UniProtKB/Swiss-Prot annotation:
Motif ('HIGH' region): 131-141
GO terms of molecular function: arginine-tRNA ligase activity; ATP binding
Domain of life the protein comes from: Bacteria
Signal peptide extent: none
GO CC, any one term: cytoplasm
Gene Ontology process terms (BP): arginyl-tRNA aminoacylation
Subunit structure, interactors included: Monomer.
Family designation: Belongs to the class-I aminoacyl-tRNA synthetase family.
Enzyme class: ligase
InterPro entries noted in UniProt: aa-tRNA-synth_I_CS, Arg-tRNA-ligase, Arg-tRNA-synth_N, Arg-tRNA-synth_N_sf, ArgRS_core, DALR_anticod-bd, Rossmann-like_a/b/a_fold, tRNAsynth_Ia_anticodon-bd
The protein's Enzyme Commission number: 6.1.1.19
The protein's name in its UniProt record: Arginine--tRNA ligase
Length: 585
Protein backbone atom coordinates (compact mmCIF):
# COMPACT_ATOMS: atom_id res chain seq x y z
CA UNK A 1 0.00 0.00 0.00
CA UNK A 2 1.33 3.39 -1.02
CA UNK A 3 0.15 5.62 1.84
CA UNK A 4 0.93 8.79 -0.10
CA UNK A 5 -0.87 7.67 -3.25
CA UNK A 6 -3.87 6.51 -1.20
CA UNK A 7 -4.24 9.90 0.48
CA UNK A 8 -3.79 11.64 -2.85
CA UNK A 9 -6.74 9.62 -4.16
CA UNK A 10 -8.75 10.42 -1.00
CA UNK A 11 -8.19 14.14 -1.47
CA UNK A 12 -9.12 13.99 -5.15
CA UNK A 13 -12.26 11.97 -4.39
CA UNK A 14 -13.32 14.44 -1.69
CA UNK A 15 -12.83 17.37 -4.05
CA UNK A 16 -14.77 15.67 -6.86
CA UNK A 17 -17.70 15.07 -4.52
CA UNK A 18 -17.58 18.59 -3.03
CA UNK A 19 -19.09 21.88 -4.17
CA UNK A 20 -15.61 23.32 -4.79
CA UNK A 21 -15.58 24.13 -8.51
CA UNK A 22 -13.77 26.35 -10.96
CA UNK A 23 -14.60 30.05 -11.25
CA UNK A 24 -17.12 29.30 -13.98
CA UNK A 25 -18.54 26.22 -12.29
CA UNK A 26 -16.36 23.77 -14.24
CA UNK A 27 -14.82 20.63 -12.78
CA UNK A 28 -11.29 21.07 -11.53
CA UNK A 29 -8.14 19.60 -13.04
CA UNK A 30 -6.85 17.50 -10.15
CA UNK A 31 -3.92 15.94 -12.00
CA UNK A 32 -1.26 18.14 -10.38
CA UNK A 33 -2.23 17.31 -6.81
CA UNK A 34 0.49 15.41 -4.96
CA UNK A 35 0.95 14.05 -1.45
CA UNK A 36 4.51 13.77 -0.18
CA UNK A 37 6.44 13.45 3.08
CA UNK A 38 6.98 16.93 4.57
CA UNK A 39 10.55 18.21 4.56
CA UNK A 40 10.45 18.42 8.35
CA UNK A 41 8.82 15.50 10.19
CA UNK A 42 7.74 17.95 12.92
CA UNK A 43 5.23 19.34 10.42
CA UNK A 44 3.29 16.08 10.19
CA UNK A 45 3.27 12.80 8.33
CA UNK A 46 2.00 13.96 4.93
CA UNK A 47 1.90 17.22 3.02
CA UNK A 48 -0.24 18.12 0.01
CA UNK A 49 -0.05 20.93 -2.53
CA UNK A 50 -3.78 20.64 -3.38
CA UNK A 51 -4.74 24.21 -2.47
CA UNK A 52 -1.63 25.64 -4.13
CA UNK A 53 -2.30 24.08 -7.54
CA UNK A 54 -6.08 24.71 -7.49
CA UNK A 55 -6.27 28.22 -6.02
CA UNK A 56 -6.03 30.08 -9.34
CA UNK A 57 -8.72 28.04 -11.11
CA UNK A 58 -11.04 28.26 -8.07
CA UNK A 59 -10.39 31.97 -7.64
CA UNK A 60 -9.45 31.80 -3.97
CA UNK A 61 -6.38 32.59 -1.92
CA UNK A 62 -4.44 29.30 -1.38
CA UNK A 63 -4.77 29.50 2.41
CA UNK A 64 -8.52 30.12 2.17
CA UNK A 65 -8.91 27.17 -0.19
CA UNK A 66 -6.74 25.06 2.12
CA UNK A 67 -9.21 25.64 4.97
CA UNK A 68 -12.06 24.44 2.74
CA UNK A 69 -10.12 21.29 1.82
CA UNK A 70 -9.34 20.66 5.48
CA UNK A 71 -13.08 20.81 6.19
CA UNK A 72 -13.58 18.01 3.64
CA UNK A 73 -10.98 15.78 5.30
CA UNK A 74 -11.39 16.46 9.02
CA UNK A 75 -13.79 13.57 9.68
CA UNK A 76 -11.45 10.92 8.26
CA UNK A 77 -10.79 8.54 11.21
CA UNK A 78 -7.17 7.99 10.16
CA UNK A 79 -6.37 11.69 10.47
CA UNK A 80 -5.31 13.09 13.82
CA UNK A 81 -4.66 16.69 12.85
CA UNK A 82 -4.65 19.01 9.81
CA UNK A 83 -3.13 22.45 9.46
CA UNK A 84 -2.33 25.05 6.83
CA UNK A 85 1.37 25.80 6.50
CA UNK A 86 3.24 28.59 4.77
CA UNK A 87 1.50 29.99 1.72
CA UNK A 88 -1.07 27.21 1.54
CA UNK A 89 0.36 23.73 1.92
CA UNK A 90 -1.72 21.35 4.02
CA UNK A 91 0.13 19.23 6.58
CA UNK A 92 -1.53 16.04 7.78
CA UNK A 93 -0.83 14.18 11.02
CA UNK A 94 -2.14 10.60 11.06
CA UNK A 95 -3.23 8.60 14.08
CA UNK A 96 -0.94 6.06 15.70
CA UNK A 97 -3.57 3.38 15.13
CA UNK A 98 -3.35 4.09 11.40
CA UNK A 99 0.40 3.50 11.49
CA UNK A 100 -0.12 0.31 13.50
CA UNK A 101 -2.42 -0.95 10.72
CA UNK A 102 0.21 -0.10 8.11
CA UNK A 103 2.82 -1.98 10.13
CA UNK A 104 0.51 -4.99 10.31
CA UNK A 105 0.29 -4.95 6.51
CA UNK A 106 4.09 -4.78 6.24
CA UNK A 107 4.43 -7.85 8.46
CA UNK A 108 1.78 -9.95 6.72
CA UNK A 109 2.90 -8.96 3.20
CA UNK A 110 6.44 -10.20 3.74
CA UNK A 111 8.83 -9.26 0.94
CA UNK A 112 5.84 -8.49 -1.31
CA UNK A 113 5.29 -5.25 0.60
CA UNK A 114 5.82 -2.47 -1.91
CA UNK A 115 4.99 -4.65 -4.90
CA UNK A 116 2.51 -2.91 -7.19
CA UNK A 117 0.69 -3.62 -10.43
CA UNK A 118 1.14 -0.19 -11.99
CA UNK A 119 2.70 -1.98 -14.96
CA UNK A 120 -0.53 -3.88 -15.66
CA UNK A 121 1.38 -6.46 -17.67
CA UNK A 122 2.65 -3.93 -20.23
CA UNK A 123 5.53 -5.11 -22.42
CA UNK A 124 8.78 -3.21 -21.83
CA UNK A 125 12.11 -3.71 -23.58
CA UNK A 126 15.18 -2.61 -21.63
CA UNK A 127 18.34 -2.56 -23.73
CA UNK A 128 21.54 -2.16 -21.76
CA UNK A 129 25.27 -2.89 -21.95
CA UNK A 130 25.37 -3.61 -25.74
CA UNK A 131 29.17 -3.27 -25.65
CA UNK A 132 31.06 -3.96 -28.86
CA UNK A 133 32.14 -7.63 -28.96
CA UNK A 134 35.82 -6.75 -29.23
CA UNK A 135 37.09 -7.62 -25.77
CA UNK A 136 36.26 -8.21 -22.13
CA UNK A 137 33.95 -5.90 -20.22
CA UNK A 138 35.86 -3.12 -18.48
CA UNK A 139 34.95 -1.22 -15.33
CA UNK A 140 33.31 1.53 -17.40
CA UNK A 141 30.67 -0.96 -18.54
CA UNK A 142 29.69 -1.80 -14.95
CA UNK A 143 27.49 1.19 -14.37
CA UNK A 144 25.16 0.87 -17.34
CA UNK A 145 25.01 -2.88 -16.76
CA UNK A 146 23.87 -2.52 -13.16
CA UNK A 147 21.56 0.46 -13.76
CA UNK A 148 19.82 -1.33 -16.63
CA UNK A 149 19.52 -4.58 -14.72
CA UNK A 150 18.09 -2.98 -11.58
CA UNK A 151 15.68 -0.84 -13.59
CA UNK A 152 14.45 -4.01 -15.30
CA UNK A 153 14.04 -5.69 -11.89
CA UNK A 154 12.08 -2.69 -10.59
CA UNK A 155 9.76 -2.83 -13.58
CA UNK A 156 9.16 -6.55 -13.05
CA UNK A 157 8.44 -5.90 -9.36
CA UNK A 158 5.79 -3.38 -10.42
CA UNK A 159 3.91 -5.68 -12.78
CA UNK A 160 5.59 -4.99 -16.12
CA UNK A 161 6.50 -7.81 -18.51
CA UNK A 162 10.17 -7.05 -19.14
CA UNK A 163 12.58 -8.19 -21.84
CA UNK A 164 16.25 -7.60 -21.04
CA UNK A 165 18.05 -7.10 -24.33
CA UNK A 166 21.64 -6.82 -25.57
CA UNK A 167 22.36 -5.48 -29.07
CA UNK A 168 25.49 -7.09 -30.52
CA UNK A 169 27.33 -4.60 -32.73
CA UNK A 170 28.90 -7.30 -34.88
CA UNK A 171 28.66 -5.86 -38.39
CA UNK A 172 30.85 -2.76 -38.31
CA UNK A 173 34.43 -1.67 -38.82
CA UNK A 174 35.40 -2.68 -35.28
CA UNK A 175 34.79 -6.32 -36.23
CA UNK A 176 37.18 -5.97 -39.17
CA UNK A 177 39.78 -4.63 -36.73
CA UNK A 178 39.07 -7.47 -34.31
CA UNK A 179 39.53 -10.09 -37.04
CA UNK A 180 42.82 -8.51 -38.14
CA UNK A 181 44.00 -8.47 -34.52
CA UNK A 182 43.09 -12.13 -34.03
CA UNK A 183 44.83 -13.13 -37.28
CA UNK A 184 47.97 -11.50 -35.91
CA UNK A 185 47.68 -13.59 -32.73
CA UNK A 186 47.04 -16.65 -34.91
CA UNK A 187 50.31 -16.07 -36.77
CA UNK A 188 52.03 -15.54 -33.45
CA UNK A 189 50.65 -18.87 -32.19
CA UNK A 190 52.12 -20.51 -35.30
CA UNK A 191 55.57 -19.29 -34.25
CA UNK A 192 55.87 -15.94 -35.99
CA UNK A 193 57.55 -13.25 -33.86
CA UNK A 194 55.31 -10.23 -33.33
CA UNK A 195 57.44 -7.47 -31.84
CA UNK A 196 54.79 -4.78 -31.72
CA UNK A 197 51.06 -4.70 -32.35
CA UNK A 198 50.44 -2.30 -35.26
CA UNK A 199 48.64 0.96 -34.55
CA UNK A 200 44.87 0.60 -34.80
CA UNK A 201 44.67 -3.07 -33.84
CA UNK A 202 43.53 -4.36 -30.45
CA UNK A 203 46.70 -4.94 -28.35
CA UNK A 204 45.15 -6.82 -25.43
CA UNK A 205 46.62 -10.19 -24.44
CA UNK A 206 43.08 -11.57 -24.10
CA UNK A 207 43.27 -12.38 -27.84
CA UNK A 208 46.26 -14.72 -27.45
CA UNK A 209 44.14 -17.76 -26.40
CA UNK A 210 41.86 -17.13 -29.37
CA UNK A 211 44.81 -17.23 -31.76
CA UNK A 212 45.96 -20.47 -30.14
CA UNK A 213 42.50 -22.04 -30.45
CA UNK A 214 42.49 -21.26 -34.18
CA UNK A 215 45.79 -23.10 -34.54
CA UNK A 216 44.34 -26.10 -32.69
CA UNK A 217 41.31 -26.11 -35.01
CA UNK A 218 42.89 -25.25 -38.36
CA UNK A 219 46.64 -25.66 -38.01
CA UNK A 220 48.22 -23.33 -40.61
CA UNK A 221 45.40 -23.76 -43.16
CA UNK A 222 44.07 -20.23 -42.67
CA UNK A 223 47.31 -18.87 -44.14
CA UNK A 224 46.78 -20.65 -47.47
CA UNK A 225 43.00 -20.38 -47.57
CA UNK A 226 41.17 -17.84 -49.74
CA UNK A 227 41.55 -14.56 -47.85
CA UNK A 228 37.82 -13.73 -47.80
CA UNK A 229 36.93 -17.20 -46.54
CA UNK A 230 39.66 -17.13 -43.89
CA UNK A 231 38.54 -13.71 -42.71
CA UNK A 232 34.92 -14.90 -42.50
CA UNK A 233 35.97 -17.84 -40.31
CA UNK A 234 38.08 -15.64 -38.05
CA UNK A 235 35.25 -13.11 -37.67
CA UNK A 236 32.78 -15.83 -36.73
CA UNK A 237 35.10 -17.45 -34.19
CA UNK A 238 36.14 -14.08 -32.78
CA UNK A 239 32.60 -12.80 -32.26
CA UNK A 240 31.55 -16.08 -30.63
CA UNK A 241 34.59 -16.01 -28.32
CA UNK A 242 34.09 -12.36 -27.37
CA UNK A 243 30.38 -12.83 -26.66
CA UNK A 244 31.13 -15.90 -24.54
CA UNK A 245 33.60 -13.79 -22.59
CA UNK A 246 31.11 -10.93 -22.23
CA UNK A 247 28.35 -13.27 -21.03
CA UNK A 248 30.73 -14.71 -18.45
CA UNK A 249 31.77 -11.22 -17.35
CA UNK A 250 28.14 -10.18 -16.90
CA UNK A 251 27.39 -13.41 -15.04
CA UNK A 252 29.88 -12.37 -12.35
CA UNK A 253 27.43 -9.54 -11.63
CA UNK A 254 24.48 -11.93 -11.94
CA UNK A 255 23.32 -10.17 -15.09
CA UNK A 256 21.59 -12.37 -17.65
CA UNK A 257 19.87 -10.95 -20.73
CA UNK A 258 16.80 -12.55 -22.28
CA UNK A 259 17.66 -11.58 -25.86
CA UNK A 260 20.97 -11.10 -27.68
CA UNK A 261 20.15 -9.41 -30.99
CA UNK A 262 22.87 -9.58 -33.65
CA UNK A 263 23.34 -6.59 -35.93
CA UNK A 264 24.35 -9.06 -38.66
CA UNK A 265 20.73 -10.29 -38.73
CA UNK A 266 19.78 -6.94 -40.25
CA UNK A 267 22.14 -7.56 -43.18
CA UNK A 268 20.86 -11.04 -44.01
CA UNK A 269 19.14 -11.61 -47.38
CA UNK A 270 20.87 -8.64 -48.94
CA UNK A 271 20.04 -6.40 -45.95
CA UNK A 272 16.32 -7.02 -46.33
CA UNK A 273 15.47 -5.62 -42.87
CA UNK A 274 17.26 -2.36 -43.65
CA UNK A 275 15.73 -2.12 -47.14
CA UNK A 276 12.24 -2.69 -45.74
CA UNK A 277 12.82 -0.02 -43.13
CA UNK A 278 13.93 2.56 -45.69
CA UNK A 279 10.95 1.65 -47.89
CA UNK A 280 8.57 2.28 -44.96
CA UNK A 281 10.19 5.64 -44.24
CA UNK A 282 10.04 6.54 -47.93
CA UNK A 283 6.30 5.80 -48.10
CA UNK A 284 5.79 8.14 -45.14
CA UNK A 285 7.80 10.96 -46.72
CA UNK A 286 10.87 10.73 -44.51
CA UNK A 287 13.47 9.80 -47.16
CA UNK A 288 14.96 11.97 -49.91
CA UNK A 289 18.05 12.28 -52.10
CA UNK A 290 20.25 15.22 -51.29
CA UNK A 291 23.48 16.68 -49.99
CA UNK A 292 24.12 17.66 -46.41
CA UNK A 293 25.75 20.99 -45.72
CA UNK A 294 29.39 20.63 -44.67
CA UNK A 295 29.95 20.63 -40.91
CA UNK A 296 30.91 23.88 -39.19
CA UNK A 297 33.70 23.39 -36.71
CA UNK A 298 32.79 19.77 -35.98
CA UNK A 299 32.91 16.34 -37.54
CA UNK A 300 29.62 15.23 -39.03
CA UNK A 301 29.31 11.47 -39.21
CA UNK A 302 29.07 10.15 -42.77
CA UNK A 303 29.37 13.61 -44.37
CA UNK A 304 30.55 13.67 -47.97
CA UNK A 305 30.11 16.25 -50.74
CA UNK A 306 27.99 13.92 -52.89
CA UNK A 307 24.29 13.16 -53.17
CA UNK A 308 23.18 10.57 -50.62
CA UNK A 309 19.95 9.00 -49.40
CA UNK A 310 18.90 10.94 -46.31
CA UNK A 311 16.43 10.55 -43.44
CA UNK A 312 14.39 13.71 -42.91
CA UNK A 313 14.97 13.54 -39.16
CA UNK A 314 14.67 17.30 -38.63
CA UNK A 315 10.94 16.86 -39.29
CA UNK A 316 10.73 14.78 -36.11
CA UNK A 317 12.88 16.75 -33.71
CA UNK A 318 16.49 16.01 -34.67
CA UNK A 319 19.11 18.74 -35.16
CA UNK A 320 20.04 17.62 -38.67
CA UNK A 321 19.02 15.10 -41.30
CA UNK A 322 20.87 11.78 -41.23
CA UNK A 323 22.50 9.67 -43.93
CA UNK A 324 20.94 6.26 -44.60
CA UNK A 325 22.73 5.26 -47.82
CA UNK A 326 26.09 6.69 -48.88
CA UNK A 327 26.83 7.76 -52.44
CA UNK A 328 28.59 4.43 -53.07
CA UNK A 329 25.40 2.53 -52.19
CA UNK A 330 26.57 1.23 -48.79
CA UNK A 331 24.39 1.55 -45.71
CA UNK A 332 25.44 3.67 -42.75
CA UNK A 333 25.55 2.39 -39.17
CA UNK A 334 22.58 4.66 -38.56
CA UNK A 335 20.52 2.80 -41.17
CA UNK A 336 21.05 -0.42 -39.21
CA UNK A 337 20.07 1.36 -35.98
CA UNK A 338 16.80 2.48 -37.60
CA UNK A 339 16.08 -1.07 -38.77
CA UNK A 340 16.82 -2.39 -35.29
CA UNK A 341 14.31 0.02 -33.75
CA UNK A 342 11.74 -1.02 -36.34
CA UNK A 343 12.30 -4.65 -35.35
CA UNK A 344 11.65 -3.76 -31.70
CA UNK A 345 8.54 -1.81 -32.60
CA UNK A 346 7.18 -4.76 -34.57
CA UNK A 347 7.69 -6.93 -31.49
CA UNK A 348 4.89 -4.85 -29.92
CA UNK A 349 6.63 -3.38 -26.89
CA UNK A 350 4.62 -0.73 -25.06
CA UNK A 351 7.83 1.02 -24.08
CA UNK A 352 11.46 0.79 -25.16
CA UNK A 353 14.17 1.89 -22.75
CA UNK A 354 17.78 2.48 -23.77
CA UNK A 355 20.50 2.71 -21.12
CA UNK A 356 23.43 4.35 -22.89
CA UNK A 357 26.97 5.38 -22.08
CA UNK A 358 27.95 9.03 -21.79
CA UNK A 359 29.64 8.84 -25.21
CA UNK A 360 26.19 8.39 -26.80
CA UNK A 361 24.91 11.85 -25.83
CA UNK A 362 24.48 12.86 -29.47
CA UNK A 363 22.60 9.65 -30.20
CA UNK A 364 19.53 10.36 -28.07
CA UNK A 365 17.88 12.97 -30.30
CA UNK A 366 18.27 10.91 -33.45
CA UNK A 367 16.91 7.87 -31.61
CA UNK A 368 13.85 9.85 -30.51
CA UNK A 369 13.41 11.05 -34.09
CA UNK A 370 13.57 7.47 -35.37
CA UNK A 371 10.94 6.39 -32.84
CA UNK A 372 8.53 9.11 -33.97
CA UNK A 373 9.01 8.39 -37.66
CA UNK A 374 8.83 4.60 -37.46
CA UNK A 375 5.88 4.42 -35.07
CA UNK A 376 3.94 7.50 -36.10
CA UNK A 377 4.40 8.88 -32.59
CA UNK A 378 2.92 5.72 -31.06
CA UNK A 379 6.08 4.26 -29.50
CA UNK A 380 7.08 5.28 -26.01
CA UNK A 381 10.84 5.59 -25.89
CA UNK A 382 13.08 6.53 -22.98
CA UNK A 383 16.82 6.93 -23.39
CA UNK A 384 19.17 8.04 -20.65
CA UNK A 385 22.90 8.30 -20.23
CA UNK A 386 25.20 6.87 -17.58
CA UNK A 387 28.20 9.06 -16.91
CA UNK A 388 31.73 7.73 -16.47
CA UNK A 389 33.08 5.66 -13.61
CA UNK A 390 36.35 6.88 -12.13
CA UNK A 391 38.32 4.15 -10.40
CA UNK A 392 40.27 4.92 -7.23
CA UNK A 393 42.30 2.99 -4.71
CA UNK A 394 42.32 4.57 -1.27
CA UNK A 395 41.68 8.00 -2.75
CA UNK A 396 44.25 7.74 -5.55
CA UNK A 397 43.18 7.39 -9.22
CA UNK A 398 43.84 4.04 -10.88
CA UNK A 399 45.46 4.73 -14.23
CA UNK A 400 44.26 2.88 -17.32
CA UNK A 401 45.21 3.05 -20.99
CA UNK A 402 42.91 1.44 -23.53
CA UNK A 403 45.46 2.17 -26.26
CA UNK A 404 48.02 0.00 -24.47
CA UNK A 405 45.42 -2.60 -23.57
CA UNK A 406 45.98 -1.97 -19.85
CA UNK A 407 42.41 -1.45 -18.65
CA UNK A 408 40.73 -2.79 -15.52
CA UNK A 409 38.17 -5.42 -16.43
CA UNK A 410 34.78 -5.84 -14.84
CA UNK A 411 35.84 -9.30 -13.77
CA UNK A 412 38.97 -7.92 -12.05
CA UNK A 413 36.87 -5.52 -9.99
CA UNK A 414 34.29 -8.14 -8.97
CA UNK A 415 37.06 -10.58 -8.06
CA UNK A 416 38.75 -8.00 -5.84
CA UNK A 417 35.80 -6.44 -3.99
CA UNK A 418 32.89 -8.84 -4.58
CA UNK A 419 29.67 -8.63 -6.53
CA UNK A 420 27.59 -6.89 -3.85
CA UNK A 421 29.72 -3.72 -3.49
CA UNK A 422 29.90 -3.33 -7.26
CA UNK A 423 26.15 -3.68 -7.82
CA UNK A 424 25.14 -1.43 -4.94
CA UNK A 425 27.73 1.29 -5.41
CA UNK A 426 27.12 1.58 -9.15
CA UNK A 427 23.65 2.81 -8.15
CA UNK A 428 24.87 5.21 -5.50
CA UNK A 429 24.87 8.32 -7.69
CA UNK A 430 22.42 9.75 -10.18
CA UNK A 431 23.20 8.50 -13.67
CA UNK A 432 23.86 12.05 -14.89
CA UNK A 433 26.72 12.48 -12.42
CA UNK A 434 30.17 10.84 -12.70
CA UNK A 435 30.73 8.11 -10.14
CA UNK A 436 33.90 7.61 -8.09
CA UNK A 437 34.46 3.96 -7.19
CA UNK A 438 37.15 3.36 -4.57
CA UNK A 439 38.32 -0.25 -4.40
CA UNK A 440 39.34 0.17 -0.75
CA UNK A 441 36.37 2.19 0.53
CA UNK A 442 33.72 -0.20 -0.81
CA UNK A 443 35.01 -3.01 1.42
CA UNK A 444 35.30 -0.97 4.62
CA UNK A 445 33.11 -1.99 7.54
CA UNK A 446 31.87 1.48 8.42
CA UNK A 447 28.93 3.83 8.10
CA UNK A 448 30.76 5.52 5.24
CA UNK A 449 30.40 2.36 3.15
CA UNK A 450 26.72 2.25 2.11
CA UNK A 451 26.58 -1.42 1.10
CA UNK A 452 28.10 -2.56 4.40
CA UNK A 453 25.77 -0.29 6.37
CA UNK A 454 22.64 -1.62 4.65
CA UNK A 455 23.62 -5.29 4.89
CA UNK A 456 24.66 -4.80 8.52
CA UNK A 457 21.21 -3.41 9.34
CA UNK A 458 19.62 -6.55 7.91
CA UNK A 459 21.99 -8.79 9.87
CA UNK A 460 21.30 -6.82 13.07
CA UNK A 461 17.56 -7.31 12.58
CA UNK A 462 18.08 -11.07 12.53
CA UNK A 463 20.26 -10.86 15.63
CA UNK A 464 17.27 -9.32 17.45
CA UNK A 465 15.23 -12.43 16.68
CA UNK A 466 18.03 -14.66 17.93
CA UNK A 467 18.04 -12.67 21.18
CA UNK A 468 14.26 -12.99 21.39
CA UNK A 469 14.43 -16.77 21.11
CA UNK A 470 16.98 -16.84 23.93
CA UNK A 471 15.32 -14.32 26.26
CA UNK A 472 11.61 -14.76 25.53
CA UNK A 473 11.48 -18.47 24.63
CA UNK A 474 9.75 -17.71 21.34
CA UNK A 475 9.67 -20.93 19.32
CA UNK A 476 7.69 -19.78 16.30
CA UNK A 477 8.19 -16.02 15.72
CA UNK A 478 5.93 -15.97 12.64
CA UNK A 479 2.90 -17.18 14.61
CA UNK A 480 3.64 -14.91 17.56
CA UNK A 481 3.93 -11.84 15.35
CA UNK A 482 0.48 -12.50 13.88
CA UNK A 483 -1.05 -11.88 17.31
CA UNK A 484 1.33 -9.14 18.41
CA UNK A 485 -0.32 -6.08 19.99
CA UNK A 486 1.17 -3.43 17.76
CA UNK A 487 -0.66 -0.71 19.68
CA UNK A 488 2.10 -1.15 22.27
CA UNK A 489 4.29 0.92 19.94
CA UNK A 490 3.66 4.45 21.15
CA UNK A 491 7.12 5.98 21.31
CA UNK A 492 7.65 8.74 18.73
CA UNK A 493 10.89 7.09 17.63
CA UNK A 494 9.04 3.83 16.89
CA UNK A 495 6.27 5.58 14.95
CA UNK A 496 8.93 7.48 13.01
CA UNK A 497 10.46 4.15 11.94
CA UNK A 498 7.07 3.00 10.63
CA UNK A 499 6.82 6.27 8.65
CA UNK A 500 10.16 5.56 7.00
CA UNK A 501 9.23 1.96 6.16
CA UNK A 502 5.92 3.16 4.69
CA UNK A 503 7.80 5.24 2.12
CA UNK A 504 9.05 2.08 0.39
CA UNK A 505 6.12 1.63 -2.07
CA UNK A 506 6.40 5.32 -3.00
CA UNK A 507 10.14 4.99 -3.63
CA UNK A 508 9.54 1.97 -5.87
CA UNK A 509 6.99 3.88 -7.96
CA UNK A 510 9.16 6.99 -8.21
CA UNK A 511 12.22 4.98 -9.25
CA UNK A 512 10.12 3.52 -12.08
CA UNK A 513 8.30 6.68 -13.18
CA UNK A 514 11.49 8.76 -13.29
CA UNK A 515 13.71 5.85 -14.44
CA UNK A 516 16.02 6.52 -11.49
CA UNK A 517 17.03 3.28 -9.76
CA UNK A 518 19.48 5.20 -7.57
CA UNK A 519 16.46 6.30 -5.52
CA UNK A 520 16.18 2.74 -4.19
CA UNK A 521 19.84 2.60 -3.12
CA UNK A 522 19.54 6.00 -1.41
CA UNK A 523 16.37 4.91 0.38
CA UNK A 524 17.88 1.64 1.61
CA UNK A 525 20.82 3.53 3.08
CA UNK A 526 18.49 6.04 4.79
CA UNK A 527 16.36 3.19 6.12
CA UNK A 528 19.43 1.41 7.48
CA UNK A 529 20.57 4.67 9.11
CA UNK A 530 17.18 4.98 10.83
CA UNK A 531 17.46 1.44 12.17
CA UNK A 532 21.02 1.86 13.40
CA UNK A 533 20.05 5.17 14.98
CA UNK A 534 17.24 3.54 16.94
CA UNK A 535 19.56 0.69 17.94
CA UNK A 536 22.03 3.22 19.32
CA UNK A 537 19.25 4.96 21.25
CA UNK A 538 18.55 1.61 22.88
CA UNK A 539 22.18 1.41 23.96
CA UNK A 540 21.76 4.74 25.76
CA UNK A 541 18.20 4.17 26.97
CA UNK A 542 17.27 0.57 27.94
CA UNK A 543 13.56 1.46 27.64
CA UNK A 544 13.94 1.70 23.85
CA UNK A 545 15.57 -1.69 23.36
CA UNK A 546 13.75 -4.12 21.09
CA UNK A 547 13.76 -6.92 23.66
CA UNK A 548 12.30 -6.31 27.14
CA UNK A 549 12.61 -9.68 28.94
CA UNK A 550 10.08 -8.59 31.57
CA UNK A 551 7.51 -7.39 29.00
CA UNK A 552 6.81 -9.99 26.33
CA UNK A 553 3.80 -8.09 24.95
CA UNK A 554 5.86 -4.98 24.17
CA UNK A 555 8.78 -7.09 22.92
CA UNK A 556 6.53 -8.89 20.42
CA UNK A 557 5.23 -5.57 19.11
CA UNK A 558 8.80 -4.35 18.66
CA UNK A 559 9.72 -7.62 16.98
CA UNK A 560 6.93 -6.86 14.52
CA UNK A 561 8.70 -3.59 13.75
CA UNK A 562 11.99 -5.44 13.26
CA UNK A 563 10.26 -7.96 10.98
CA UNK A 564 9.00 -5.09 8.84
CA UNK A 565 12.59 -3.87 8.51
CA UNK A 566 13.69 -7.35 7.46
CA UNK A 567 10.92 -7.51 4.85
CA UNK A 568 11.66 -4.13 3.29
CA UNK A 569 15.45 -4.47 3.38
CA UNK A 570 15.24 -8.00 1.92
CA UNK A 571 12.88 -6.83 -0.80
CA UNK A 572 15.01 -3.84 -1.77
CA UNK A 573 18.26 -5.80 -1.74
CA UNK A 574 16.68 -8.53 -3.87
CA UNK A 575 15.73 -5.94 -6.50
CA UNK A 576 19.31 -4.66 -6.47
CA UNK A 577 20.47 -8.32 -6.61
CA UNK A 578 22.56 -7.97 -3.46
CA UNK A 579 22.71 -10.53 -0.66
CA UNK A 580 20.73 -9.90 2.53
CA UNK A 581 22.93 -11.60 5.16
CA UNK A 582 21.41 -12.82 8.41
CA UNK A 583 24.74 -12.64 10.21
CA UNK A 584 27.92 -10.59 9.76
CA UNK A 585 31.12 -11.00 11.75
Amino acid sequence: MNVFKNFEQKIKKSLKESDIKGKNGENLDLSKITVDPPRDSLHGDLSTNASMVLAKSVGLNPRTLAEKIIALLKDDPSIDHLEVAGSGFINIKLTKSFWHDVLKLMITSGTDYGRTQIGQGKQVNVEYVSANPTGPMHVGHCRGAVVGDVLANLLQFAGYNVTKEYYINDAGKQIEILAASVLLRYREALGETINKIPEGLYPGEYLIPLGQSLVQEFGDKLLTMDNEKALSIVKERSIDAMMTMIRQDLATLNIHHDVFFSERMLYMNNAQAIRNTINDLTLNGYVYKGKLSPPKGQTLEDWEPHEQTLFRSTDVGDDQDRVLIKSDGSYTYFAADVAYFRDKFHRHFDEMIYVLGADHAGYVKRLEAVAKAISGNKAKLTAFLCQLVKLFRNGHPVRMSKREGSFITLRDVVKEVGRDPVRFMMLYRKCEAPLDFDLEKVTEQSKDNPIFYVQYAHARCHSVFRQAQENLQIENPSNDLMIAHLDQLTNDSEISLIHKLAQYPRIIEQAIVYKEPHRLAFYLYDLASNFHGHWNKGNDNPELRFIKPNNKKLSLARLGLVQAFINVLSSGLKIVEVKAPTEMR
